[in-house]
Amino acid sequence: MNNNYTSLKSSIDEEGELKTDHEIDLEKGLLPEYNSEEEGALPTYSDHARSSNPPNTHRENHSSGTTDDSSPFLIKLLISFTPIVLLNALAVCYLTYKDAFFKDYGAAEWTLFGFWCLVCTLALIILTYFYETWTKAVKVTAIGLFNIRREMMIIIWILWLIICCILFGCVKDGRLNLNKALIYSTCTISAVLFLIVSSVCIPMWTLWRALSGMLQVLGIHGIIALLVNGSMSLFGKHFGWRGYEIEGFVLFFTGNALFLYEMERPGVLKRMRNTTGNVIGYILEGIGNIGNAIGRIGNAFRGANDNNDIPLGEMEVESEV
């Protein structure tokens, strides 16, 4: 019995199969071999592999459902609340200083207090709502100030010089009584200024160097003050207002100059201290050498006197020998 098998495929279909079996996709290259023993080892170009292993989407990477990288709401609220707290802290300090903090409040005062609370609440809402905007503005401003920190240091120093001149003028006119402690107030205010300048206009990695320079300058101030005032006290003298003004001005300008020089050239004060020690050592060594020279001269004179005391007969015996 002859089995006449007739293919239902047409010649066109067979040609298509030959083409699909032997043609190479120029973009994908050769098809990888399929290994049935490995689980899920489907060819790379298989549509089934694409459908069963879809690429990770943004939503899968963020399982919590958030679609942005913004800060959480509580952190935004806390950061927005910080400037309001600082502003209110200044107001509380001022009212406490005036002894008017929640003291003898009437209707007008309580109305003003309620209005202030409303303003703070609205400010908190606005700062929280526009968090990205104002934080970006603060960052841009901080970067701009950081880039012009040298110019800012000069501007702050000029403003501080004007403030000190006004302060000294008030002291001289008697409108501000510091009880002859002008030098100590100058040192204190200079220390506060150094701290502000070092924390605002100088990068944080130089903050320790700035504080170190400030302490060294204040140490120089203290040493000069102790030497001058101590020597005046030993002789029973005391500074008048003119003396305190001169001393305060001298220490103020020397302190500013030394601090700026230290910030521009790190280690200047340390080298100055070493140089001062070396100079003092050289001076003491010179004084010692002068003392030794004087001692040698004295020994020479003593030797000459001893030779003059020797009898003439002994000198003749020594010469014959």
UniProtKB/Swiss-Prot annotation:
Its main location: membrane. GO terms for biological process: meiotic drive. The chain crosses the membrane at residues 73-93, 110-130, 151-171, 188-208, 210-230, 243-263. This is Meiotic drive suppressor wtf26. GO terms for cellular component: vacuolar membrane. InterPro entries: WTF. Acts as a suppressor component of the dual wtf meiotic drive system, and can suppress but not confer meiotic drive by compatible poisons. Wtf meiotic drive systems promote unequal transmission of alleles from the parental zygote to progeny spores by encoding a poison and an antidote from the same locus; the poison is trans-acting and forms toxic aggregates in all spores within an ascus, wherease the antidote is spore-specific and targets aggregates for degradation by the vacuole. Belongs to the WTF family. It is found in: Spore membrane; Vacuole membrane. Homomer. Interacts with other proteins that exhibit high sequence similarity. Residues 29-68 are annotated as: Disordered. It is a multi-pass membrane protein. Keywords: Membrane, Transmembrane, Transmembrane helix, Vacuole.
